[in-house]
């Protein structure tokens, strides 16, 4: 902003982590109502405290990794709040694309006897696929009547994943699965910005983009050299510049 490469804007950073690792910006009585927190509380509080332009056309929702997943999901479900959305290496954008990863991670796995055992023994940096599976279960297939973890895991009894009620709950919050029923919301966005690294292969970004093309929904897609966490500062700056040019009419 000091170099006048960006227009004036207020950036609100949201912490979406939980004891399980990530909330995936879902509403859950066990880990918190992150969906409503982002779309209702944060918007209302920001407009009440700061010099905002309190209207849809001046709001963007963006995120990196899990945040990119959440941003795309929430702008579809809450179409009247945001006009721009940005997803930097949104993870995952297609739950089906990662199904085999989650299934393999959970196969033969002994379920921890407590949340402390889970968080102490299953760490993202050591076994991200298993840790991510538990985080998603806490967000998407919570079960308040099933202590001590209060969640259900998919791929347990059904040989047909598409008939597995737990897996179906995961798909209900899957950005790719939501496109067909929320195409009007996406089509009404002023801007959709997506990026991912050329070395990233498990996000489902390409599947999501094909779905946008299928419904003739406009978007901007940038592929950078590197992997998930590379060039984060540059990527955020590039996305913000993209939004800024739109808000200022190209100035």
Each predicted region: which residue ranges?
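Non-catalytic cap/lid and distal C-terminal segments of serine-dependent acyl enzymes
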Residues: 1-251
């Amino acid at each position: 902003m000091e170099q006048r490469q960006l227009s004036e804007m207020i950036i609100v950073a949201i912490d979406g982590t939980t004891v399980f690792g990530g909330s995936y910006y879902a509403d859950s009585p066990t880990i918190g109502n992150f969906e409503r927190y982002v779309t209702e509380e944060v918007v209302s509080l920001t407009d009440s405290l700061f010099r905002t332009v309190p209207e849809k056309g001046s709001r963007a929702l963006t995120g990196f990794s899990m945040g990119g997943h959440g941003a795309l999901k929430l702008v579809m479900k809450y179409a009247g709040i945001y006009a721009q959305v940005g997803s930097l290496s949104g993870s995952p954008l297609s739950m089906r694309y990662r199904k085999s990863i989650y299934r393999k991670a959970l196969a033969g796995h002994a379920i921890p006897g407590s949340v402390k055992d889970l968080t102490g023994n299953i760490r993202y940096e050591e076994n991200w696929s298993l840790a991510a599976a538990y985080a998603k279960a806490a967000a998407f297939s919570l079960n308040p009547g099933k202590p001590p973890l209060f969640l259900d895991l998919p791929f347990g009894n059904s040989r047909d994943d598409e008939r597995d009620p737990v897996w179906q709950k995961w798909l209900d919050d899957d950005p790719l699965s939501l496109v067909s029923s929320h195409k009007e919301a996406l089509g009404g966005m002023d801007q959709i910005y997506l990026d991912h690294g050329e070395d990233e292969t498990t996000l489902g970004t390409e599947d999501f983009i094909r779905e946008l093309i299928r419904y003739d929904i406009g978007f901007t897609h940038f592929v950078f050299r590197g992997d998930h966490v590379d060039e984060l500062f540059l990527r955020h700056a590039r996305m913000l510049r993209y939004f800024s040019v739109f808000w200022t009419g190209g100035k």
